[in-house]
């Protein structure tokens, strides 16, 4: 797979990821507006504008800017949600999702750098934020008071959303890994100069014939006709 094809694939992947985050924030806006949580409704509007603008980032060459910007946005958004409605609503659990997101993106998009220092640092920040939020629970009152039934409903919705995002993230990662494995297998089975299949590819295709009980008098002869002494060193 060429570098341009790989970059286009990564950009398409992040474009779809951005659509998922945009839909989630639209749902958050609807929920907060319905509950009268004006502060988070305003923050949701800002986040929605950010994700609309982020579509242009997914088409750029600097995809790391998009990944780390989203990571920071999730951190700030969920901390504010906990401050507004309390830890019982489970908004903080999305910080765990963000860790999956960071390391998945680090493999899929940022793997060329072969370093994940920023991802590790941000995950440490997420962990510290989680610990602080749980430690401060009970020492402050949420900015908005909600009925216990509403809180429980939000909590269930947030847990469901977290599980959905983790499953989606892992499925996307597995799909990408399978795609990369297929590309590597194809690269290993075909000669780079002639683009002809090699003996391993042929043997895999003819394996059923060789193992058949009624093979008959069929035989296979493979001859390597490459004269590497005459191949230019530029190859």
PLM regions: where:
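Hydrophobic transmembrane alpha-helices
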Residues: 25, 50-51, 56-57, 70-100, ...
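Membrane-water interface at the C-terminal end of transmembrane alpha helices
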Residues: 105-118, 167-175
């Amino acid at each position: 797979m060429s570098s341009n094809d790989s970059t286009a694939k990564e950009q398409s992947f992040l474009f779809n990821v951005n659509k998922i985050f945009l839909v989630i924030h639209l749902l958050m806006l609807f929920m907060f507006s319905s509950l009268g949580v004006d502060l988070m409704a305003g923050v949701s509007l800002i986040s929605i504008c950010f994700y609309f603008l982020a579509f242009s980032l997914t088409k750029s060459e600097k995809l790391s800017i998009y990944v780390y910007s989203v990571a920071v946005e999730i951190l700030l958004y969920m901390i504010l949600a906990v401050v507004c409605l309390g830890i019982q609503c489970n908004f903080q659990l999305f910080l765990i999702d963000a860790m999956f997101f960071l390391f998945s993106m680090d493999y899929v998009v940022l793997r060329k750098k072969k370093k994940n220092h920023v991802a590790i640092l941000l995950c440490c920040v997420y962990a510290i934020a989680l610990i602080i939020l749980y430690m401060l629970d009970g020492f402050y009152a949420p900015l908005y008071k909600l009925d216990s039934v509403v809180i429980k409903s939000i909590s269930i919705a947030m847990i469901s959303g977290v599980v959905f995002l983790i499953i989606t993230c892992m499925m996307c990662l597995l799909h990408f890994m399978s795609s990369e494995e297929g590309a590597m297998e194809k690269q290993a089975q075909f000669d780079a100069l002639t683009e002809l299949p090699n003996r391993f590819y042929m043997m895999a295709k003819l394996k059923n014939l060789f193992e058949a009980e009624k093979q008959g008098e069929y035989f296979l002869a493979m001859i390597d006709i490459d004269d590497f002494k005459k191949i230019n060193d530029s190859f």
